[in-house]
Amino acid sequence: MSTFEDADTEETVTCLQMTIYHPGQLQSGIFKSIRFCSKEKFPSIEVVKFGRNSNMCQYTFQDKQVSRVQFALQPFKQFNSSVLSFEIKNMSKKTSLMVDNQELGYLNKMDLPYKCMLRFGEYQFLLQKEDGESVESFETQFILSPRPLLQENNWPTQSPIPEDGVYSSYFTHRSSPAEMDENEL
């Protein structure tokens, strides 16, 4: 006989909310395999992969410009912390991944901030982590943005990430446009 007092305490679960945008999202069905607005639960030992290969990735993009495995998110627990954190690893040999203003090349990884902008090709992801108590599992939730996220969230404008992954130093080292006097031309 189970009573209310004997019932297990329900723990809240860490949720990684991902708002995504691609300029061709309405015409091409790029995100047709992603369930928007509903939460999906994963065990905390699972590495969640994103890419175009449905046999290897939990989340797939219907786009030949995306690598078979584009990037991976792995939960972990920081030393002396009671909540889950995430690290992101670029799995693409041909395209760099931008996390805020940090460029990740092939197999580079970093800890994911609580809120950050992730970009590759023409894809834009706004990732936001909501802490939970459980370290046994976590959830993901996708939201489709009707507008580019860089402008909508007042993030600094950045040059698009070229598909060959090679950046021009002109774009990566300049943070704002330079003003010139017309006599300097």
UniProtKB/Swiss-Prot annotation:
InterPro entries: FHA_dom (IPR000253), SMAD_FHA_dom_sf (IPR008984), TIFA (IPR033621). It holds the Pfam family FHA. The keyword Transcription regulation does not apply. GO terms for biological process: cytoplasmic pattern recognition receptor signaling pathway; innate immune response; positive regulation of canonical NF-kappaB signal transduction; protein homooligomerization; tumor necrosis factor-mediated signaling pathway. Coiled coil: none annotated. SUPFAM superfamilies: SMAD/FHA domain. PROSITE patterns: FHA_DOMAIN (PS50006). It is found in: Cytoplasm. GO terms for cellular component: cytoplasm. Phosphorylated at Thr-9 following detection of ADP-D-glycero-beta-D-manno-heptose (ADP-Heptose) by ALPK1. Phosphorylation at Thr-9 by ALPK1 leads to the formation of an intermolecular binding between the FHA domain and phosphorylated Thr-9, promoting TIFA oligomerization and TIFA-mediated NF-kappa-B activation. Keywords: Cytoplasm, Immunity, Innate immunity, Phosphoprotein. Belongs to the TIFA family. This is TRAF-interacting protein with FHA domain-containing protein A. It comes from Rattus norvegicus.
